[in-house]
Structures are given as structure tokens and as C-alpha cells.
């Protein structure tokens, strides 16, 4: 009699394991393995370089009249390097922003679902143990 009681439970475990196995394989095969930088870090670096470029463009040597316009090659190279760095950061921030706003995948539901199934199984085991020990 006890053997018949556990047969549906065993079938249920096999079905759940099969569902998890089929759901994990396609998602893990399509997973992106390249690490993406954090968006907040990119925004902070972008703001800092943008501020530096803004202060360089508003400095007295850059805003002098055309008669006094003697730009040092090192200063212009530094300003162009900073502007190139800000465009690189802007491009990386845009690319990381595009990849961050995707819909949740199956993998984000596997953990909570497995925890829920495990909790239900443990509660059922405790109830079955108490029921058997009371007889």
C-alpha cells in the first residue's frame, strides 16, 4: 500500500525534472557569455570626462579672441583625446543601455520555481512524517 502511495509522487518528480531539463538546455545554449560592464559605472565615467571636456572648452585659452588664438599642440591633442574618450564612453553607454533593458529569460524563473517546488516537497514530507508517527 505504501508503494502505491509513492508512485504518483515519483512520476511527479520525473515530470518536473524533465521540464526543468528541457527548459534549461535551450536557454543555456543561447546564453551570452561576454561580460557586460555595469551601466552606473559607465555613466559616472562619462559624466566625469564630459565635465573635464566642458571645463577645457570654457577655459580662457580656449575662449580667447581670434587675434590671441595660439593653441598649443599638446592642449589641442589633450582636448581631442578627451572628446574621443567621451564619444567612446557615450557609445559604450548606449550599447550597454540597449542590452540592459531586455525581457526576463527563462533562467530568471528557474531559481524561484525550484525553491518553490523544494519548499512544497519538504512541507509534504514533514506532514507525511507527522501523519505516520501519529499512527
From Swiss-Prot:
Keyword annotations: Glycoprotein, Host membrane, Membrane, Secreted, Signal, Transmembrane, Transmembrane helix
Signal peptide limits: 1-29
Coiled coil feature spans: none
Glycosylated sites: 84
Primary role: Secreted effector that inhibits stress-induced relocalization of the transcription factor NAC069 to the nucleus, thus affecting its broad role in abiotic and biotic stress responses.
Subunit structure as annotated in this protein's UniProt entry: Interacts with host transcription factor NAC069.
Family statement: Belongs to the RxLR effector family.
Motif (RxLR): 38-41
Protein name as catalogued: Secreted RxLR effector protein BLR08
Compartments where located: Secreted; Host membrane
Bias type Low complexity, positions: 57-69
GO cellular component, one term: membrane
Free-text comment about domains: Has the canonical translocation RxLR motif, but lacks the canonical EER motif, which characterizes most oomycete effectors identified so far.
Disordered: annotated span: 56-97
Chain ranges passing through the membrane: 109-129
Topology term for the membrane: Single-pass type I membrane protein
Organism expressing this protein natively: Bremia lactucae
